[in-house]
């Protein structure tokens, strides 16, 4: 069994084992649940690591009497509270009926279950019953009837753990939750560095690594979504940690709304990481006999560097978070009309793009923003999900039939969560928009938010979208979300419960997505929020791929996709070849380089193919053929980062098949210099004894490629593409 429990008169010891890790905690003689160990596999009781120093201004547990060395302020706690002597970051906070806010959680019982728990209404890692176990540890406040159940999901073969928390009010008066984190991890004395992934619109998930300093560091979003600006993931690592060496802990929040990751480096040089819902946008009235479930955190530990950490997250998210028909299969090569036409199109213009795309081998045409309502710019029409027949004279069905006659499938864009003030929907239901009575709402992109916590809004959107999907043979939906959320208010809740809206909004989005993906299992849903503004594991539970960024510049995409790869699989990355000069940067890169970068994702085109030269069109045909040849390797192979594009003169990555018989190395050399020395790069993950051959007949042993490396091609011009394919005999 992956979970072992040893009970004595004085304590209960919990040990969770995966293939290469051990996680251990103990309910001690006072019922305090202490964290003992998370790291490489070890045997025995790790309680000997507990230190009980006598530290001034660190108060002592009442039951400890004269034992001045027992302090919640210095001990490693499994789920930290506030108001009872631990002055570090709490994981949970609540206000009781009498106005007090102390919580003193003590151990009550445990339960071990076969299989992996699920969370009603929320995304969660899933597994077959024989692939996982669940540990539940029940804690209870000493003075009230608040009960907390810590849930641990264990996937031993994947070396992955999950955590979530259920909070139940067993009393007779409401309790107000003001913080309910999903994850709390205390790490022992030592030097630690923090990796997080910051950014902005059109430049998401830039890797940043800094030493922990005394005090509190934070990455978070209060935008109602996980945001472009910080990603709901974090890594703590030792200073010597590299891709292949050193210790590191990683955590990913399966949630698409506002979040907070806080890390405190305390007076004892211990680190505490707390991850969960952002408390600034959370206040939940927990009624008697009601239960609140937090979202889930997925986490792991590696003692062999960041590469192993990433491989575990990528595999788990690809195979145990993403769902449905498109979970593992290669995605269709698509052409999106957005950067080719923006709002200015009609059926003739769209068909002209489709005809050329079909001739070159593209699988699917996606019609982006502007096909519905009164939508000639971004000032109107959102919410009116009916076809604009001034643009599409024969309606959507006629266009889809014509596209299908070309041998292509058809996809369509929606922005369901938004409403324009200049729309029939707003004129009929202004009360459905999120806005505060008596205040002018903040507009963003000239649009407001629909209140997705409202079941009537969910039903309206479900009917609109399902009517469109049923009206024609549609194979793909791009689900966009183009603003941050402000002006939080809903008429559905009383004043003292308005703090529930941000979380209820996300639950509403999930409920609508669950209904639609269940009703249309053959449709590929792609998430989007102005690119990568909601690129998180929670959204991947419903949409197996997400548009990675609105920045389609090939050079900058290497940086964005590099940061994305630390947690997310390549199969989840929406990535296209776009026009040059690039619409975001003005940069000109070769079409071969743009294709290589886009192949490290779903692959497609976002331009007017009719405007390409004959030479470029021939390149497109070859690129599509190449992607279809390598698609399974790219989406299901093991991904290796072979450079850091923020530091190196090139971006390089590799895909290695599970049986290690096939390797694809791709990337770009950023700059070319006269008499330039060629770069030599070592590969990883190969069969050391196998002989690998390229298409031109060159042969190398695996250990040669991994130790001596391979020379990159001689570059000619900046942003020079690299693509090398090796197959073992």
Question: Which ranges hold each PLM region?
Answer:
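C-terminal beta-sandwich/jelly-roll accessory domains of carbohydrate-active enzymes
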Residues: 671-729
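Aromatic-lined carbohydrate-binding/catalytic grooves of carbohydrate-active enzymes
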Residues: 326-463, 476
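Polysaccharide-binding surfaces and accessory modules of carbohydrate-active proteins
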Residues: 5-7, 11-19, 23, 33-264, ...
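Short Pro-Gly-centered flexible turn/kink motifs
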Residues: 102-107, 284-303, 720-727
